[in-house]
């Protein structure tokens, strides 16, 4: 091109400003799906931990497409989702200025891993969180019932307080993640009764999501620190002979007014942003107790979802898990929030039935020639390291 272009679309979206570090590492749910009272009572979100990615093979079910009934290879993400424990219920009332918290009722007993969430330094603390509140169940149980009755009478939105069981994961962290999750379906009284029945009980992920469902993933993205404008905004590099650097913006604005407009691309923080990734297809909701949760109808090999040697920088997934199409925000070990979609997606991609033919469980550390240890032993034979001294 021998002349300069006099028009070009701007680089980078202004819809995600400010590009700064997220305040909390857990993904916040700012909106929940619309409540339908005719449906049964159920949670609308769940917390999990990103374990890693794998590869799947399936037949595409898309009539009219040239790829219909043909094999496709796709990337998928494994999210470790140990059962969550319900420890409280919150009632909200509608006001002209939005929802307002009415009252909160906690369970009688809270585990140590969730009580750690209320302390900055657990070891130097007196560890007395909720000891006074728990005494109400012995001395003044009537007050707890009164608060639940208030929620039934005045509240229009009911949410439970549930925490993860991080001790069941390979992570070294001992502090559980606590979140408010909205209950949809049924009347307000049904919601409160459901929450009370599940106090101090586990809720599994298969009671929230199912296969072939489209869900949203809310998480904090991978952080990259302070980055230059070319990497951060994708601006064009300047010509080779440019004075004082190439990876810059040539003109950041007029001389007067003597300030830089907020729309101008600048260097700064890149990554570790709070993001919501929508419409991820659920390929599988697996059970941790199933020793063949990595097998399919076409691949009858008895294997789990874990690759040989475990997921790199995570370990083995021994709990229930969710297999999602594509990649999701965040790094391995990071807590992610899985939420039901805010709207009903009727596209062919959303309504098609998924039938997995093969899930890759080869080692992620090296060439990955074998799917199971038995397959490796059959090919390699007994190795010297396997012999007992």
UniProtKB/Swiss-Prot annotation:
It is found in: Cytoplasm. One of its GO terms (biological process) is ribosomal large subunit assembly. SUPFAM superfamilies: Translation proteins. Keywords: Cytoplasm, Ribonucleoprotein, Ribosomal protein. GO terms for molecular function: RNA binding; structural constituent of ribosome. The keyword Flavoprotein does not apply. One of its GO terms (cellular component) is cytosolic large ribosomal subunit. Component of the ribosome, a large ribonucleoprotein complex responsible for the synthesis of proteins in the cell. The small ribosomal subunit (SSU) binds messenger RNAs (mRNAs) and translates the encoded message by selecting cognate aminoacyl-transfer RNA (tRNA) molecules. The large subunit (LSU) contains the ribosomal catalytic site termed the peptidyl transferase center (PTC), which catalyzes the formation of peptide bonds, thereby polymerizing the amino acids delivered by tRNAs into a polypeptide chain. Belongs to the universal ribosomal protein uL3 family. Component of the large ribosomal subunit. Mature ribosomes consist of a small (40S) and a large (60S) subunit. The 40S subunit contains about 32 different proteins and 1 molecule of RNA (18S). The 60S subunit contains 45 different proteins and 3 molecules of RNA (25S, 5.8S and 5S). This is Large ribosomal subunit protein uL3. It comes from Candida albicans (strain SC5314 / ATCC MYA-2876) (Yeast). The lineage of its organism: Eukaryota, Fungi, Dikarya, Ascomycota, Saccharomycotina.
């Amino acid at each position: 091109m021998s002349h300069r272009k006099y028009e070009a679309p701007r680089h980078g979206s202004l819809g995600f400003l400010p590009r700064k570090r997220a305040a909390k590492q857990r993904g916040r749910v700012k909106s929940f799906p619309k409540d339908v009272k005719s449906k049964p009572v159920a949670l609308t979100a769940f917390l999990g931990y990103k374990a890693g990615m794998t590869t799947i093979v399936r037949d595409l079910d898309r009539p009219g497409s040239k790829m219909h009934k043909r094999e496709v290879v796709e990337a998928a993400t494994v999210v470790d989702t140990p059962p969550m424990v319900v420890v409280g219920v919150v009632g909200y009332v509608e006001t002209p200025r939005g929802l307002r918290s009415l009252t909160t009722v906690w369970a009688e007993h809270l585990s140590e891993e969730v009580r750690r969430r209320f302390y900055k330094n657990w070891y130097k603390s007196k560890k007395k969180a909720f000891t006074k509140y728990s005494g109400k169940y012995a001395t003044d149980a009537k007050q707890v019932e009164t608060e639940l009755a208030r929620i039934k009478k005045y509240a229009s939105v009911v949410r439970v307080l549930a925490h993860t069981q991080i001790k069941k994961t390979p992570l070294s962290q001992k502090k559980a993640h606590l979140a408010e999750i909205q209950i949809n379906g049924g009347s307000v009284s049904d919601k409160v009764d459901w929450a009370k029945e599940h106090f101090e009980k586990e809720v599994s992920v298969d009671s929230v999501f199912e296969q072939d469902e489209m869900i949203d993933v809310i998480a904090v993205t991978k952080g990259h620190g302070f980055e230059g404008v070319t990497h951060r905004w994708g601006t064009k590099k300047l010509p080779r002979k440019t004075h004082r650097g190439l990876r810059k913006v040539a003109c950041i604005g007029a001389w007067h007014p003597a300030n830089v407009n907020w729309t101008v691309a600048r260097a700064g923080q890149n990554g570790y942003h709070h993001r919501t990734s929508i419409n991820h297809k659920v390929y599988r909701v697996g059970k941790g107790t199933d020793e063949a949760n990595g097998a399919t109808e076409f691949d009858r090999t008895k294997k789990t979802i874990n690759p040989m040697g475990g997921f790199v920088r995570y370990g083995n997934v021994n709990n229930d898990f969710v297999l999602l199409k594509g990649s999701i925000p965040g790094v391995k070990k990071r807590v992610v929030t899985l939420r039901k979609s805010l709207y009903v997606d009727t596209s062919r991609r959303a309504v098609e039935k998924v039938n997995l033919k093969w899930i890759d469980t080869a080692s992620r550390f090296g060439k990955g020639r074998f799917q199971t240890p038995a397959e490796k032993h059959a090919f390699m034979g007994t190795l010297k390291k396997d012999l007992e001294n």
